[in-house]
């Protein structure tokens, strides 16, 4: 039970990133009602595909990664494609996290050189300190994540306590100024429910216990959905649609949103609470993603090359590439992040649907089977493909632009 609680918080902590705070800017022209329905729909899709991995793991050892699952049903081609996509995606995410973590840490460190030197030092300190928990093992990640998660939630509750008394019912009734904005916002909210790269680590940590993994996924993603709802309720209730649109014109960033809420609540505490939350959200997301990457590399080496690398070696392979990209070639991970939605859709939607399709043909009587037949699998697959094509339609001018 203790591991199940920890796994649940890892699921929620991985999803609830610092980007959550700026999500109301994405939904600024949509209104609360449409935003809530969109969030619930995308939560349902991505929780469904996460549970497909639970079903799949009944046919494999508890310590194998997604690449080995893909190889089990699609041969070495499946392993190569799935592993390559997952590793590139997670490397790009970690590079972004260490870059962001370094920027936050730089303000706290004593001056030891120019700004560029201080940034490099801060990135290294951030990576070494929090990366050490990854190297030690999932148990240590579980422990620190619990502490960080509860402090993060405390900061979040403080922000809500300052905002909720000031919400206006009329603001909550705002309708979309353009229905096409709902479509444009879908990819941003879609990736906000991503934690699928951490599922192999959680399954291994829970010793392949199907019930515990299901609980961790359902409750962890449910906590995330509830947090997203409360934040959207608070911001959409506090700010009118016209005020949102003014923020988009003047400063379409989290700072712009915080400044607007500060003017209404008249509480300087809110800015500090938001900073604490965003910092801890970045760290908990970093922990979940890095743990998933380390386990992915371990699975690749063990299953493909029969190399049983130690945790320190795996840690170096996990963190050196993204740190180098972050410090010396940031354009590289920024380019990769430009295709983050497509890579995420592949391993969070396309891959589990394809694997379960084959697995059910080979293993028709598994003890646990996710609800829904082939029609639902096809529907989810089509939705995933459509959502990932939306950014291209926005760039081509067929859909309106949204922040995110």
What are these regions (language model features)?
Residues 8-15, 83-86, 108-137, 151-159, ...:
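Transmembrane alpha-helical segments of multi-pass small-molecule transport proteins
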Residues 2-11, 75-89, 176-186, 263-281, ...:
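Select transmembrane alpha-helical segments in multipass membrane proteins
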Residues 1-25, 30, 47-51, 63, ...:
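Membrane-interface "cap" regions at the ends of multi-pass membrane proteins
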Residues 119, 176, 294, 301, ...:
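C-terminal membrane-solvent junction of multi-pass transporters and transport-like membrane proteins
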Residues 113-125, 139, 146-259:
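Helix-loop-helix junctions that connect adjacent transmembrane segments
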Residues 103-107, 126-148, 205, 326-335:
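Membrane-water interface regions at transmembrane-helix termini and the short interhelical loops
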Residues 48-59, 63-113, 275-299:
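Hydrophobic transmembrane alpha-helices that form the core helical bundles
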């Amino acid at each position: 039970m203790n591991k199940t609680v920890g796994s649940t918080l890892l699921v929620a902590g991985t999803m609830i990133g610092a980007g959550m705070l700026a999500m109301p800017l994405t939904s600024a022209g949509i209104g609360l009602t449409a935003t809530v329905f969109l969030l619930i729909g995308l939560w349902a899709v991505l929780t469904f595909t996460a549970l497909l991995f639970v079903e799949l793991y009944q046919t494999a050892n508890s310590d194998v990664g997604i690449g080995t699952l893909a190889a089990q049903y699609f041969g070495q081609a499946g392993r190569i494609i799935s592993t390559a996509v997952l590793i590139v995606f997670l490397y790009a995410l970690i590079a972004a996290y260490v870059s962001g973590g370094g920027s936050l840490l730089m303000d706290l460190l004593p001056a030891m050189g120019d700004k560029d030197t201080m940034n490099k030092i801060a990135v290294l300190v951030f990576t070494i300190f929090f990366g050490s928990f990854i190297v030690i093992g999932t148990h240590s990640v579980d422990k620190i994540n619990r502490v960080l998660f509860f402090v993060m939630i405390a900061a979040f509750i403080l922000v809500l306590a300052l905002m909720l008394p000031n919400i206006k019912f009329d603001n909550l009734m705002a309708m979309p100024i353009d229905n096409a904005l709902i479509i444009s916002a879908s990819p941003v909210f879609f990736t906000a429910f991503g934690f699928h790269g951490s599922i192999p680590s959680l399954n291994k940590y829970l010793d392949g216990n199907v019930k515990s993994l299901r609980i961790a996924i359902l409750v962890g993603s449910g906590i995330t959905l509830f947090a997203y709802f409360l934040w959207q309720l608070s911001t959409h209730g506090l700010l009118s649609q016209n005020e949102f649109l003014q923020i988009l014109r003047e400063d379409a960033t989290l700072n712009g949103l915080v400044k607007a809420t500060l003017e209404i609540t008249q509480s300087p505490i809110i800015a500090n609470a938001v900073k604490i939350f965003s910092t801890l959200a970045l760290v908990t997301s970093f922990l979940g993603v890095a743990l998933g990457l380390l386990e992915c590399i371990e699975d690749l080496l063990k299953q493909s090359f029969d190399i049983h690398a130690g945790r320190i070696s795996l840690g170096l392979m996990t963190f050196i590439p993204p740190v180098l990209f972050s410090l010396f070639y940031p354009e590289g991970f920024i380019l990769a992040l430009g295709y983050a939605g497509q890579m995420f859709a592949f391993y969070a939607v396309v891959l589990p649907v394809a694997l379960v399709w084959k697995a059910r043909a080979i293993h028709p009587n598994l003890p646990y089977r996710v609800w829904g037949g082939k029609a639902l699998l096809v529907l989810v697959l089509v939705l995933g493909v459509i959502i990932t094509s939306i950014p291209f339609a926005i760039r081509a001018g067929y859909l309106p632009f949204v922040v995110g």
